[in-house]
Curated annotation (Swiss-Prot):
Pfam families registered for this protein in UniProt: PilN
Name of this protein: Type IV pilus inner membrane component PilN
Its job: Inner membrane component of the type IV (T4S) secretion system that plays a role in surface and host cell adhesion, colonization, biofilm maturation, virulence, and twitching, a form of surface-associated motility. PilN/PilO heterodimers form the foundation of the inner-membrane PilM/PilN/PilO/PilP complex which plays an essential role in the assembly of a functional T4 pilus. In turn, associates with PilM and facilitates PilM functionally relevant structural changes.
Entry's Gene Ontology cellular component terms: plasma membrane; type IV pilus
Keywords associated with the record: Cell inner membrane, Cell membrane, Membrane, Transmembrane, Transmembrane helix
Major site of localization recorded for this protein: membrane
Location relative to the cell: Cell inner membrane
Description of the deletion phenotype: Deletion mutants lack surface pili.
Database matches in InterPro entries: Extracell_DNA_Util/SecSys_Comp, PilN
Record-annotated membrane-spanning stretches: 19-39
Length: 198
């Protein structure tokens, strides 16, 4: 005779499927939690790594800013030294010229004229002095105009001043340009050459 199984197999099957579903659901939850944890760990490590890089870059930027400032100070100091060297070289180069100019001032000085003040700014020489007469001042200006080292004397002022009961002097102020022999010829030749090129 055939055997009939009267056990509630459908309920057992349902119960078995329910257990499988719960096991799968638990596995998915555990896997999701593990995935979230690993993702959090990864992003935390990435953020910490980036923060470490940023800190390193900030420190390097501070070091580079200090070096840039130091380089800027060195450039400024170098420029000051170059300017000082140029001034010293100009003074050394002009030393014989200044001696010649003073020699020419003495040579152009006629009798009865003396200088009370002399100021040289660049190539301009401002002279103050006194003379016995206006003719002596005129002689001084003619002598300066004839000099190779002096040019363009300009009389600014002449005043008659009484010194004591009898003496009278003419106080004057004039300006003159310092030049070098051959300098005007060189400028004229350069101007002619420039005109020929045009």
């Amino acid at each position: 005779m055939a055997r009939i199984n009267l056990l509630p197999w459908r309920e057992e099957l349902r119960e078995q499927r329910k257990q499988q579903f719960l096991v799968i659901l638990g596995g998915v939850l555990v896997a999701s939690a593990a995935l979230v944890f690993l993702g959090d760990q990864y992003f935390t490590a990435a953020i910490e790594n980036q923060n470490a890089r940023n800190d390193f870059l900030r420190k390097e930027i501070v070091v580079l800013d200090a070096r840039i400032k130091e380089i800027s100070e060195l450039k400024s100091r170098r420029q000051q030294l170059l300017e000082r060297m140029k001034i010293i070289q100009d003074l050394q180069g002009n030393r014989p010229i200044i001696g010649r100019v003073f020699d020419q001032l003495v040579r152009t000085l006629p009798d009865g004229v003396y200088f009370t003040d002399l100021k040289m700014t660049g190539k301009n020489i401002a002279i103050a002095g006194a003379a016995e007469s206006n003719n002596r001042v005129s002689n001084l200006m003619r002598n300066m105009d004839a000099s190779e080292w002096l040019t363009a004397p300009t009389l600014n002022e002449v005043k008659a001043v009484t010194q004591g009961a009898v003496d009278q002097a003419n106080v004057f102020q004039l300006t003159v340009q310092q030049t070098q022999p051959g300098e005007e010829d060189a400028k004229a030749k350069h101007g002619v050459a420039q005109g020929a090129k045009k």
